[in-house]
């Protein structure tokens, strides 16, 4: 489980580290948090030959930017619901009507569900950087309002970066801070946290393939609003 040239990783070591992070996620007792903080292990053909080409393993994490506790419009669906046991003389007719009303309500609920706008979210991805040979955190904002550009650094600072990180990231600029480039899988312009300063920070920790990405996320993720559930850290 050791890392040959720590903190640098080769492709095999990074792939194994991704599998360990995925297992921690699958085994953690996340409860309801699992519905909004989603992690999955991915394999894809890398289109950027600077990343080595061929198939690559990476980790994708998604979370909502705004979480509505009434997601699903339950308050609207339950407006006409009653627990009353009172029954009139025309019970069968009333029940038939109730059944028809329920079917119509179900259809209306489905229409509302289809029409409901998609939730704004952030999608993070962990890839092995081809030059620095350490994990690199990419991220993309999705389903933002039409008047809010997703590929805009001001939007990133407003939506993702906690106040305590803003001054430091702006001082670092494009080297050591938030940078933009073509995504290694899709080729679409995307943001990433520049990995050049990671080596000094993570070298202070005792890492192997089983815990490397958990420690790395603790060092890197917070500056763009990515926090690992504590249940995963306890695995």
Swiss-Prot record:
Record's keyword annotation contains Transport: yes
One example of a Gene Ontology biological process annotation: autophagosome assembly
Mutant lacking the gene: phenotype: Significantly decreases the radial growth of colonies under nutrient-rich conditions.
Active site: 196
Iron listed as a keyword: no
Membrane protein topology class: Peripheral membrane protein
GO molecular function annotations of the record: Atg12 conjugating enzyme activity
Keywords: Autophagy, Membrane, Protein transport, Transferase, Transport, Ubl conjugation pathway
Domain of life of the native organism: Eukaryota
Broad enzyme group: transferase
One cellular component term from this protein's GO annotations in UniProt: cytosol
Main location group: membrane
EC number: 2.3.2.-
Subcellular location: Preautophagosomal structure membrane
Protein function: E2-like enzyme required for the cytoplasm to vacuole transport (Cvt), autophagy and nucleophagy. Acts as an E2-like enzyme that catalyzes the conjugation of ATG12 to ATG5. ATG12 conjugation to ATG5 is required for proper localization of ATG8 to the preautophagosomal structure (PAS). Likely serves as an ATG5-recognition molecule. Autophagy is required for proper vegetative growth, asexual/sexual reproduction, and full virulence. Autophagy is particularly involved in the biosynthesis of deoxynivalenol (DON), an important virulence determinant.
Subunit details: Forms homooligomers. Interacts with ATG7 and ATG12.
Family label: Belongs to the ATG10 family.
Name under which the protein is recorded: Ubiquitin-like-conjugating enzyme ATG10
Gene: ATG10
